[in-house]
Amino acid sequence: MITKNLPLTDLHRHLDGNIRTKTILELGQKFGIALPAYDIESLTPHVQIVEAEPSLVAFLSKLDWGVAVLGDLDACRRVAYENVEDALNAQIDYAELRFSPYYMAMKHKLPVAGVVEAVVDGVQAGMRDFGIKANLIGIMSRTFGTDACQQELDAILSQKDHIVAVDLAGDELGQPGERFVSHFKQVRDAGLNVTVHAGEAAGAESMWQAIQELGATRIGHGVKAIHDPKLMDYLAENRIGIESCLTSNFQTSTVDSLANHPLKQFLDHGVLACLNTDDPAVEGIELPYEYEVAAPAAGLSQEQIRQAQINGLELAFISDAEKAELKEKVKDRV
């Protein structure tokens, strides 16, 4: 269960993986895009996981429909704005919304820097209207190669005052982190934090590389750390965060069952792991589900669930003063 008088955070939440079915339908119609169905009920199975059996291929095919309808920069702005409202509706006090501007721009050849600006505008408007605190993490999509990632990074850094970190996501096996060392030197030189998707498709060596060569202080998913005792010790001793996404890891076949997810062992070992959604619209879940259903199914005790919630605030890319402000805001909440 969620501890009400502690801030609830979602630090690993893809803005471009959380596009409402209704929005996909409306934007598809607006831009004359052929969709697999033309009402919400019929469209849902094409854009959201409804199958019981996990499948990475099915997951990714559903993910792509959201960005397929981003026909102009206003559509990107709308999606960013709605993401802030969705976070509010999920009882989240602080969200870090991550997005790949190249992925969002690709289908309709939008200007990548324009996408970043539109997302910043949408999130800032959402914060004003909904009173929730959110920050942005820019993603380099390694799947598209080093040159595309440099273009993406240039666009992200053009709005660096509105972005707290840069992430590397996508094809972990085909595009290993060593190809992006110079990119992340630019990130660190710009004063931004580093989080990297690692130890999801590839093994623990990918996590070592992200930490030691790219400068990651947080790792997205990181499930393969469990196979490397030295890495487990290093994560705990150096307070490297693990952004765990239980339902997502099951739906993408990263783990074969929630019961076999390593999150409980991470927490037992003193690793700073927290609970997050990943792509909530595609998964058909929200953050309360991760706390109330997925975490107990993964074997976490109530005390461990509470610890994961505490870890989420500690790992947030905000100042100690901002963390204290969030704590103060919710301390009397019941």
UniProtKB/Swiss-Prot annotation:
Reaction equations catalysed: adenosine + H2O + H(+) = inosine + NH4(+); 2'-deoxyadenosine + H2O + H(+) = 2'-deoxyinosine + NH4(+)
Listed GO biological process terms: adenosine catabolic process; hypoxanthine salvage; inosine biosynthetic process; nucleotide metabolic process; purine ribonucleoside monophosphate biosynthetic process
Matching InterPro entries: A_deaminase, A_deaminase_dom, Ado/ade_deaminase, Metal_Hydrolase
Catalytic site: 200
Site (Important for catalytic activity): residue numbering on this chain: 221
Source taxon at top rank: Bacteria
Alphabetized CDD domains for the sequence: ADA
EC identifiers of the protein: 3.5.4.4
A family per Pfam: A_deaminase
Keywords: Hydrolase, Metal-binding, Nucleotide metabolism, Zinc
Cofactor note: Binds 1 zinc ion per subunit.
Cofactor(s) it depends on: Zn(2+)
GO CC annotations on file: cytosol
Keyword Metal-binding in annotation: yes
SUPFAM superfamilies referenced in this protein's UniProt entry, alphabetically: Metallo-dependent hydrolases
Keyword GTP-binding: no
Molecular function per GO: 2'-deoxyadenosine deaminase activity; adenosine deaminase activity; zinc ion binding
Purpose of the protein: Catalyzes the hydrolytic deamination of adenosine and 2-deoxyadenosine.
Family the UniProt entry places it in: Belongs to the metallo-dependent hydrolases superfamily. Adenosine and AMP deaminases family. Adenosine deaminase subfamily.
Name by which UniProt lists this protein: Adenosine deaminase
Native species: Vibrio parahaemolyticus serotype O3:K6 (strain RIMD 2210633)
Organism phylogeny: Bacteria, Pseudomonadati, Pseudomonadota, Gammaproteobacteria, Vibrionales
